[in-house]
């Protein structure tokens, strides 16, 4: 059986990269939450 997670860096950045997050209000809120929490990595 084929596994569900097939890693692909291009898809990863197109779907959950920083620039994509900044496009929507919800995405910007997510980045701000992660900043407030002190995450080392904010997005893919």
Curated annotation (Swiss-Prot):
GO biological process, one term: translation
Keywords: Ribonucleoprotein, Ribosomal protein
GO cellular component: ribonucleoprotein complex; ribosome
GO terms, molecular function: structural constituent of ribosome
Domain of life assignment: Bacteria
Listed Gene3D superfamilies: 1.10.287.3980
Annotated region described as Disordered, given as residue ranges: 1-26
Pfam families with a match to the protein in the record: Ribosomal_L34
Record-stated family: Belongs to the bacterial ribosomal protein bL34 family.
Name this polypeptide is given: Large ribosomal subunit protein bL34
Organism whose genome encodes this protein: Bifidobacterium animalis subsp. lactis (strain AD011)
Gene that encodes the chain: rpmH
């Amino acid at each position: 059986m084929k596994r569900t997670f097939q890693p692909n860096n291009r898809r990863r950045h197109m779907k959950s990269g920083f620039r994509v997050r900044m496009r929507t209000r919800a995405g910007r809120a997510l980045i701000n939450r992660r900043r407030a929490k002190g995450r080392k990595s904010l997005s893919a």
